[in-house]
Design a protein with these regions (language model features):
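Mid-to-C-terminal Rossmann-like scaffold of FAD/NAD(P)H-dependent oxidoreductases
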Residues: 306, 314, 318-384
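A Rossmann-like FAD-binding core segment of flavoenzymes
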Residues: 70-99, 176-263, 356-384
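FAD-binding core/adjacent interface of flavoenzyme oxidoreductases
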Residues: 1-11, 69-158, 234-242, 253, ...
């Protein structure tokens, strides 16, 4: 067994993990290591060849691969150690990591601090209760994206997409450009799940129909999918009888949401937020276990990669403060409460006297325009913010 002792271990080499490792080095943390299960750094950005990344951070419209490469280049120039093709199988409350690697075999690390940046995973057909057989041709949007962009395969000729999340919208355009006929996008909610710019650029510009308050009722086919039955939904999301329609297709793409990947967190006994499905965090993005931090989509599914990177930097600064003894997470905390029309807020708690400025990431419960956000502290309104965005919202407040 290979044994290592590090100051900071970052689990995951995606945008959050890379940003966290680089920021930790800037904060003076000496021995930093990234543990990544894939062959390369970059995470999901490896298969994102469309543009729109980095507008806030770099002021440019970069492809996902370009965005990732900027961080990879910085890591190569640093003394950050990277373990690729290494799978973490356990993280303990004592900040120990057990991993396995084809090159090193079993790896055991004792860490001064840990940043968990494992990202998120896609919901599958079984998690959204799709009825019918289990034929070939039913894929998550991320799988289709990898097939086309990285492996050079077309998974079908005629497609139906269930869900209007951003990756599903982007793949509607991508499949159209590759010659696949996208017959429609169906969304169970009464409003689209993706960003407005993706609705316009990926659907409207290519005349791909979007049907709201609708779902796939049944999958048809035995060996290979032959078609689906779609139907309209009422306000209770129940199928409206008589609205069923059969659509022939050989590909069903599921873009039905993402779930933070927290099996390691649960194994370490870290409490999770029922709304975000990620760890409960303070303003340093430290979990309820001192010295273990969370960043990126492992804590909440962000809409923009810029926010993912920013969360990694917040966690890294918190880890550096923890390692130096400046902030060991011992002070009493106040709960952050999501008020009217707010679905959730990250962080979920603030430690008294820790900081003057705190970054909040929040999402509304329903699409809104010209948003006014009130921040109430000790019963009195301390700040008011306005935004034209529906979601996401990022606030920097002085408390």
């Amino acid at each position: 067994m290979k044994k290592m002792k590090v100051d900071l271990a970052v689990i995951g080499g995606g945008p959050a993990g890379m940003a966290a490792a680089l920021e930790a080095k800037r904060q003076g943390v000496e021995k930093v290591i990234i543990i990544e299960r894939d062959k390369k750094l970059g995470g999901i950005l490896q298969q994102c060849i469309h543009d729109g990344f980095g507008i806030q951070r770099f002021g440019e419209r970069l492809a996902g691969t370009e965005y990732a490469q900027r961080f990879i280049d910085q890591i190569k120039e640093s003394d950050i150690e990277v373990l690729l093709e290494t799978m973490v199988i356990e993280m303990t409350p004592e900040k120990e990591i057990y991993a396995c690697s084809g090159k090193h075999g079993m790896v055991y690390l004792t860490c001064g601090a840990i940043v968990a940046a494992m990202g998120c995973r896609e919901r599958t057909a079984s998690q959204v209760l799709l009825y019918g057989k289990r034929p070939a041709g039913v894929y998550t949007a991320g799988s289709v994206q990898r097939f086309i962009n990285m492996e050079g395969y077309l998974p079908g000729k005629e497609a139906v997409i269930l869900g209007s999340g951003d990756i599903g919208l982007i793949m509607a355009r991508r499949m159209t450009l590759e010659g696949i006929k996208v017959k429609g996008v169906y969304e169970v909610m009464s409003s689209p799940g993706g960003l407005t710019r993706n609705i316009v650029q990926c659907l409207e510009d290519y005349e791909i129909p979007l049907t709201l308050s609708a779902t796939v009722k049944e999958i048809h086919g035995k060996e290979r999918i032959e078609g689906v039955t779609v139907a309209k939904l009422d306000e209770n999301r129940e199928v409206i009888e008589g609205t069923e329609e059969y659509i022939a297709c050989d590909l069903l793409v599921l873009a039905v949401g993402l779930i933070p990947e927290n099996e390691l967190s649960k194994g370490a006994g870290i409490p999770l937020d029922a709304k975000t499905k990620g760890p409960v965090l303070d303003e340093n993005f430290m979990t309820d276990i001192p010295g273990i931090f969370a960043a990126g989509n492992v804590s909440v599914v962000y809409d923009l990669v810029d926010y993912v990177s920013q969360s990694g930097e917040i966690a890294a600064r918190g880890a550096a403060a923890y390692l130096s003894g400046k902030d060991r997470g011992e002070k009493e905390s106040n709960e952050v409460v999501a008020g009217e029309n707010v679905n959730f807020v990250v962080p979920e708690k603030i430690r008294r006297g820790e900081k003057e400025e705190v970054s909040f990431f929040l999402r509304v419960t329903k699409p809104l325009k010209k948003i006014k956000v009130e921040v109430v502290q000790n019963g009195a309104r301390s700040e008011e913010h306005t935004s034209e965005l529906q979601s996401p919202i990022h606030l920097v407040c002085r408390l």
